[in-house]
């Protein structure tokens, strides 16, 4: 019985099996990184929702006047921070600063605030899988 090359064949088979194991390990690491990034984005979204809620609580007159009833998009900076803002200007600044931070922290990040009269709904939306469509969101309700 000739066994020439049999050991080489065993080594090649072991190498193929080992290669599949390494590929599976690499896929596991990539998936773990994806889940970690997703959790980070959700944490940022939660922090951002609480940020605008705190800004709203700090500007009671702005809430009473309805200045926070429909925040969406990036808005504009009213330029009054150094000179003193009215409650309406402060609400405008809060919306601008908040959505600027959403865009900086989250991929395709944006936020909106809506109300049904007594309850404010704060929504932070971002593109979690980076396919171009903002498809993940964090919703928080606030009753000031």
Language model features with spans:
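Aliphatic-rich helix starts adjacent to a transmembrane/signal segment
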Residues: 2-50
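Flexible, low-complexity segments enriched in proline/glycine/serine and punctuated by aromatic residues
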Residues: 13, 37-39, 46-144
